[in-house]
C-alpha cells in the first residue's frame, strides 16, 4: 500500500470509530484499552499494528485513563494522538532523494490530495509536529471533525467523510502494489516492500520511530523510555540505531548507557566497549575457576557419571520456536510429541524399568528432571507432595492446555485472519516459555526437562580438563566459560532459551547491574540472530530467519526488510521478563483448584 493509500486508511479508520459510536448509551465510557482494540481491528498489516501500539495512547487517555466516545477530535490531546499515528506512517514510509511538495499540510495528507511522486514525508514533520506556536492553530483546525454531526451509515462500498469525496472501502494501492500483493492477500500479513534508506529517520530499537536527535523536530518517545525501563531497568538507556536499507544492522552502531559505569567517570560505552569491559571482569572469575552452583542431581556413587538423556526423548523447544516462526503452525505429530512429553512429565516415567546396573542407575539419575527453585528434585510431578513445592511447578494439565490453545490460535490467525487473536498467541506462547523455563529475570528455575544440544566447541574453563575424553556429553554447567561474546556468538549453536535460562540463574548475574547487562546481551543476540541471515556457523543450522512477527503475530510470509521489525521484539521481551507473577499466579490457581 502506498503512502496515499495509507493516509486515506488513517482517515477512514478514525471515521469508522467515530461512526460506530455516534449514538452512545447514557453515561457510556470506554477505556483506552477498548478503543485501542477497536482501532487495531481496522488495521490490516501487522507492522502497522505494532507501530500504532508504540504510539502515545496513554497520553490520549489522559490522567483518568478513560475517554468519552465519540472521538473528540477537537481535543488537543486526541489530535496529538492522530498526529502520532501519522508520525508512524511518516517514519515507515519515508522517501529520500525526491522533490519536496512544499505546500502540503495535514488536511492534504489526510485527504490524499497530493502527488505521491513529488511528496516527501520529511517535509510533513514541520507541519504535523510543529515547533512553532503559529502552526499549532492551523494543525488543530485541519484535524477537527464535527463530533456532534450524525450521519447515516454509508453504503458498503464507500464511506463519505464530512463533505469530502467518497473513499473506497478496499485498500487504495498503486497498480504496482496490487500486482505484487494480489497473490498474497490470503495471508494475515504480506511481505513488505523494501523501502529506500533515509538517514534522517531513526528507529528506536524497542519500537517507536523518532526523528534523528540532530533534527529540529523530535517527537518525545515516552513509551520507549517506559518500555526500556520495564525491560532493562532504570539503569539502562538504549539509544537509537540508524535505519538500514534492508537486512540487519551492525551492533556497533548502538551506544548503551549503564548507570553503574559512572563509577569510573565514563558514562557511555559502545557495545564493544561494554563487552570488553565485562569480559575483563568475567575473565577474572574464569581464571580463578570460580564455579556456579546449580541445583543438580547427586549421583548415588561419586564414580558414576550422570549421562545426558537422549535428545529424541526430550521436548525440543528450539525446534518448536523455529517452526512457529517460519510457517506459523504446529503439526499434529508435534502436538502428539508434546502431549507424550507432558504425559511422561505427569506420571511415573522418570524412574522406571531401569536395570540395576551402572548404566541403568546413570539413566535413572539423569532423568530425575523435575527440580524446584530450592534444588529439590522429584521423580515426576505426581511425586511432589509439599504444597509449597507443588506451586513452584505448573501442573502438567496447564501445559497441555497451553499447547492446545497455541495450536488453535496459530490456525485461526493464519487461516482465518482473526487479527485480534495475535495478542492471545503471544500471551499463550510466552506462558509456555514460562512454564518450561520459569521466570528468566529471577535467577530461579522451576523445572529442567530439556537437554543441552551436543556442541563440540563449547567454551569451558580450565577445570574442564578432567572431563575431556569422557562420554558424559556436554561439560557440567560450572565448567562452561561465560563471556559476553560467548553469548553473542554461540546463540545459534545452543538452545536459545537455555542460554537465557543459564544467564538468569548464574550467580555472577545476581546483581541488578549484571542482570541489566545480561538483558542487553539477550536483546542484541536476538537482533543479530534474526536480522542477519548469514550469521556465521548458524545459517546452515537454522536457515533463513523470519521477522519478529513470527513471535507476535505468527505470520507465514513476512521476512525482515528493515529495522522496523524490531518493533515486534519489544512486547515479546517485555512479557518474557515479566512472566514471574503471571506464571506463579496461574500455578497457585491451578494447585488450589485441584485441591493440592
Curated annotation (Swiss-Prot):
One of its GO terms (biological process) is proteolysis. One of its GO terms (molecular function) is peptidase activity. GO terms for cellular component: viral capsid. Signal peptide: none annotated. It comes from the Viruses. This is Structural protein precursor VP8. It comes from Rice ragged stunt virus (isolate Thailand). 120 subunits of the putative clamp protein VP8b appear to stabilize the capsid shell. Keywords: Capsid protein, Hydrolase, Protease, Virion.
